[in-house]
Amino acid sequence: MSYHEEERHGGNGLDWFEESMSSLLAADVDLAGGGGDAGGGGYAWWWAASPAAQQDDIGSVVAQTLSPPSTAAPAAASPSIASPAASSPSDVPSSSSKKRKSPAHRAPGHTGGKKGGGGKGGGGGSDRDMRWAEQLLNPCAVAVEAGNLSRVQHLFYVLGELESFSGDANHRLAAHGLRALARWLPAAVGPAAAAAVRVPPCSERPTTAFAAAEPRLFRASLIRFHEVSPWFALPNALANAAIAQASTCGAAGATPRPLHVVDLGVSHGVQWPTLLESLTRQPGGRAPPSVRLTVVGPGATATSPVAPFSASPPGYDFSPHLLRYAKSINLDLRISRAATLDDAVPGDDGEALVVCLQFRLGHAAAEERREVLRKARGLNPELVVLSELDSGVGVVGGDGGSAAGEFAARLELLWRFLESTSAAFKGKDVEERRLLEAEAGAILAAADVAAAGEGREGWRERMAAAGFEEAPFGAEAVESARSLLRKYDSGWEMSAPSPAAAAVALRWKGQPVSFCSLWRPAA
């Protein structure tokens, strides 16, 4: 796909991305029926089967795989999956033509989730009995942690037959989960033992790494994701509303002050055009006299690898675009970059300082979280915006939990991402979706650093310990967020703030995804 860039001026907050979007929409072709060879070969029975029959077949494979071995006679092997007991690694299919095809190849009419149809659709279904990938991956994680290599090998064979980065949410989860378990295996059992386990090769072309993508594709993917999914868009909208209010102390008719935003997040500039535009529409038409944006790099925490979605590719720089846009709406904008929060130097006393901590701190180790919050408190900000995943698990090693249990929690969260992106992209296998899903899959990395998140209650305790007190969202901000959510798939919902919980939570089909909360320095 080719992305051509040209400078744009004026218009709304996303005009500076217009070229990316036009290229993206031109390339948005439904590939659901374009993959695979229709010849069928030895697997025509699989392609020709109805979706219900396909699901039943996979269900029987899962049941057979997870059932205890019979003492009387060995169970019959699946028509497609070789029995590890009777097969050597060389017998395992290594070509996509020897694997079960994904639904994108089998069912040209399938479009995944769609607006108004998120209740049971969206790429694989929400019911536990339909989520076969987790039924295979979680026992495999337990086997890896226990060092049960024969069990690991057996499940690797089965997962290798069913995985597909272009299939429905189950097939894609199997693909991401299998690769994550294969990377974890040497650390769990030792390199020598891990070398004896054969990892089925992936026959599909590898997806470009998020931080190594072509800059125009990277930018267009972020924009498209905000257009079709509220995963980041809703927390960003809530943050922007709170920041705009902070610039005037929340008082109607108050004189706007210079605004300084410290961005320790994952928006890569996509969040800010909307904020800049809203600042020019303040009551009385009085925008802040100046706006300063300090972007804190992905190395602000020592976590390795860096938090998903936090790194950008070499050559990607949103600053020139954003500066041109600010100039077109007569806003004085300055952009600087900081390696850590230590370099985010506050400005004048009259400056409204807001620190945005969005989707990065939750991937850091417990001590790093405390240190970053301590530094944020030291800046004495007017407001802190905290947006994080709402998975409700704790740091591994800190609560006695097992690595396999942590893997299961991360797998649950990744399922929600994959199922919701199926709905967002209407089942289409496009490069932008693959790029985003590959980065989201990084959450399955070996669970030896930090958890996927610790839930709202855990963060409330952590913020209070750092010297902050929770602040409520304005009614207008909440209503605007609710209105924004209506443009997305009906599987999305948000829980409004209450006296007991001031944060706004985002949910997919009733299950928690993330929350956005506001904090001020405690008196």
Swiss-Prot record:
InterPro entries: TF_GRAS (IPR005202). Residues 131-203 are annotated as: Leucine repeat I (LRI). It is found in: Nucleus. Residues 445-520 are annotated as: SAW. Pfam families: GRAS. Residues 64-130 are annotated as: Disordered. Expressed at low levels in roots. One of its GO terms (cellular component) is nucleus. Residues 353-442 are annotated as: PFYRE. PANTHER family: OSJNBA0084A10.13 PROTEIN-RELATED. Plants silencing NSP1 and NSP2 exhibit reduced expression of the strigolactone biosynthetic gene D27, reduced levels of strigolactones and increased shoot tillering. Rice NSP1 is a homolog of Lotus japonicus and Medicago truncatula NSP1 genes, which are transcriptional regulators essential for Nod-factor-induced gene expression. Although rice roots cannot form root nodule symbiosis, rice NSP1 is able to complement a NSP1-deficient mutant in Lotus japonicus. Rice NSP1 is able to complement a NSP1-deficient mutant in Medicago truncatula. Transcription factor involved in the control of strigolactone biosynthesis in roots through the activation of the beta-carotene isomerase D27, which participates in a pathway leading to biosynthesis of strigolactones. This is Protein NODULATION SIGNALING PATHWAY 1. It comes from Oryza sativa subsp. japonica (Rice). The gene is NSP1.
